[in-house]
Amino acid sequence: LHEGHIRMRDLAEKKTGMQTTFEICAKNADKPPLTFQEIKRTLDQFDENDSWVMTSAGRFSEKAEMFPNSVFIIGADTLLRVFDEKFYSSNKDMNEHVERFNDHNIHFLVFGRKVKDKFISLEDINIPSKIRSRCTGFNEGYYEPEWEKDE
């Protein structure tokens, strides 16, 4: 949890009028599972006013099934991975997973991110037309330099 996450939460709550719940994913699709110590360190960052949930839903399609009618607040770098075929068995498999966003009424609030010295935003991502309307972007004007992070 860093200042960028807090800023994203605050901007998202202001834009949507909804309360934010942080998700801690113990088993991410492109990272090793979190250790007990990593989970404890993560949870220790929250205070009693923060809302959080822990899952093992490594893909956003799984999160969609767990949390229907939600708005997921993510960075553009994360949205790129949602459409990366390396996380699926085939293009057809990826499209079936993406369709779950429609099935479960999922929306994405996408924040621009600096990745390898280039700022990417929602407009830079090739989003399947069947879910394009489910994505809303916050662009560079909302980006805070102190929380830039190259990944």
Question: Which stretches of residues belong to each language-model region?
Answer:
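Nucleotidyltransferase catalytic core that binds NTPs
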Residues: 1-151
